[in-house]
Design a protein with these regions (language model features):
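Glycine-rich phosphate-binding loops of nucleotide-dependent enzymes
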Residues: 1-278
Length: 278
């Protein structure tokens, strides 16, 4: 237990005491300008679904972190599922422009380089009774094999171990059951499997929910690294500081529709953003 005087309290100090160490560098992104390519990698056109989504349209660019924010029931979580083909939209379509493919199922999305991190981690993103290795290998080890090329169990285990090491996943071995892990380490396993898949487009729905500040910092660093490698990310979050800290562009939703669009280069005003949410 650490007791502080009011005069000694700061956000940085609180973060350090909560995780037991100092966080080096900037918590979110250090740049204040939007930076992404001109190439459009995904188009969502006039998406409507079950009275929850109403005529939602937008484009995602290569190397862009596109944030979606709003109140919990604004429709953004359903939108994330629809983008990955997990919901059958009533009208509209989601297109991956590189292959000119319409996303109608998770199988199509995955086959064409998409990944999805659900906000319901234990129910939808992990095989809880499986090991760390099984979960990381579940996306098919795409980054290190070609179509039809057999990879030995030994190589797959080596790659799973590499992800454990690079993501600093705390565990006894890759044979440890995921169910026995903390929330933060479970989330690292989820990220590890999409790193193994080398997904070009990632839908991240509340990727830092239920993890400590240290793991959050690791996740932000990883998201930044993926952006710099040209990966495109849809970041759905109920945490406004997270959205403002990470997004190149930020779309606000209310009652299933887009109400505002804002750019990092222009600066994000939290008060203004909240006004568009409510």
């Amino acid at each position: 237990i650490k007791t502080l005087e009011n005069k000694d309290v700061s956000v940085e100090a609180m973060r350090s005491y909560m995780i037991g160490r100092e966080l080096s560098g900037h918590y979110y992104r250090e740049d204040e300008t939007a930076s992404c390519g001109d190439e459009v990698v995904l188009k969502a056109e006039h998406i409507s679904w079950g009275g929850v989504l109403h005529d939602v349209s937008f484009e995602l660019h290569r190397g862009e972190i596109l944030g979606f924010g709003g109140l919990s029931e604004c429709g953004m979580h359903t939108l994330g599922r629809a983008l990955y083909g997990l919901e059958d939209v009533l009208t509209g379509k989601v297109t991956l422009t590189k292959d000119d493919v319409e996303v109608k199922s998770p199988e199509v999305a995955f086959a064409h380089g998409m990944g999805y991190v659900s906000k319901n981690r234990d129910q939808e993103s992990l095989v809880l009774n499986g090991t760390i290795g099984v979960n990381i290998q579940s996306t098919g080890y795409k980054a290190n094999r070609g179509f039809g090329i057999f990879i030995s169990d030994k190589k797959e285990k080596e790659y799973a171990q590499l992800q454990v090491d690079e993501l600093a996943i705390k565990c006894n071995s890759i044979f440890q059951p995921v169910s026995a892990m903390s929330g933060g380490n479970k989330q690292k396993v989820v990220f590890g499997k999409w790193l193994a898949a080398d997904a070009d487009i990632l839908i991240l729905d509340c990727p830092t929910r239920g993890v400590d500040i240290g793991v959050k910092a690791s996740m932000y660093k990883l998201i930044n690294a993926m952006k710099k490698r040209g990966k495109s990310i849809v970041l759905i979050s109920e945490e406004l500081p997270e959205l403002c800290g990470m997004s190149d562009r930020l779309i606000i939703m209310k009652d299933g529709a887009i109400t505002g669009e804002f750019w990092r280069t222009d600066g994000f005003d939290s008060t203004e953003l909240i006004d568009w949410m409510i």
